[in-house]
Curated annotation (Swiss-Prot):
Cellular localization per UniProt: Cytoplasm
Protein name: Translation machinery-associated protein 22
Record text about domains: The SUI1 domain may be involved in RNA binding.
PROSITE patterns membership: SUI1
Lineage: Eukaryota, Fungi, Dikarya, Ascomycota, Saccharomycotina
Keywords assigned: Cytoplasm, Ribonucleoprotein, Ribosomal protein
GO MF: mRNA binding; translation initiation factor activity
Family: Belongs to the DENR family.
GO biological process: formation of translation preinitiation complex; translation reinitiation
Subunit annotation: Interacts with the 40S ribosomal subunit.
Length: 195
């Protein structure tokens, strides 16, 4: 009987395809750079001049040019898309509102995190366990999600969110704290306020 040996497959750290298939993705240039830094032997096997010449020898010159133009166009589109997403993330801000419920009780509302691909339910659960309070995810009037946390933990929440965004490489994102107080009931004209 022959012994079955598992084949070890090496995956790209950029697009998560095997390096032989990176050319079908949209970030070939970054994939090549990553492969050259992490596995020079495989890079030489796939992208050396000899390897490229043998792969393209069966294609006509016109077809080769067309393929390279399409690939360059795809790469430019993908780079522009990633740049737009990064600018959108950096331009947005996280808003932490401290809302007064009663005289001494507060709720904080955290909104603006949906842009950063953060799982709101997991974050609410983390806040609930970290701050030992109740936390939930609700929808706002404009159909965006926000996290409501009971208690005045806005400073701690701000620190945690800044650390979370920093881990994602988004240091320039603004995290703003706002105090929102309930409006007091207006007394009728001529009536004296109760003491």
């Amino acid at each position: 009987m022959t012994e079955v040996v598992a084949r070890e497959v090496y995956y790209c750290g950029v697009c998560s395809f095997p390096p032989e298939y990176c050319e079908f993705g949209v970030s070939l240039k970054r994939c090549k750079d990553w492969l050259q830094d992490n596995n020079q032997e495989l890079f030489d096997k796939i992208y050396s001049d000899d390897a490229l010449a043998t792969q393209t020898s069966t294609l006509s010159i016109e077809r080769q040019e067309k393929i390279s133009q399409e690939l360059a166009k795809k790469q430019l589109k993908e780079e522009a898309k990633q740049e737009r997403e990064l600018q959108k993330k950096l331009a947005s801000k996280v808003l932490i509102k401290r809302i007064e419920r009663n005289r001494r009780k507060h709720i904080i509302s955290i909104s603006g995190l949906e842009v950063f691909n953060i799982d709101m339910k997991k974050l609410a659960k983390t806040f609930a366990s970290k701050f030992a309070t109740g936390a939930s995810v609700t929808k706002t009037a404009d159909k965006k999600e926000e996290i409501l946390v009971q208690g005045d933990v806005s400073d701690e929440a701000k620190e945690y969110i800044e650390k979370l965004l920093e881990e994602q490489g988004l240091n320039g994102v603004e995290v703003e704290q706002v105090d929102e107080k309930k409006k007091k009931k207006a007394t009728a004209p001529g009536a004296t306020p109760a003491a």
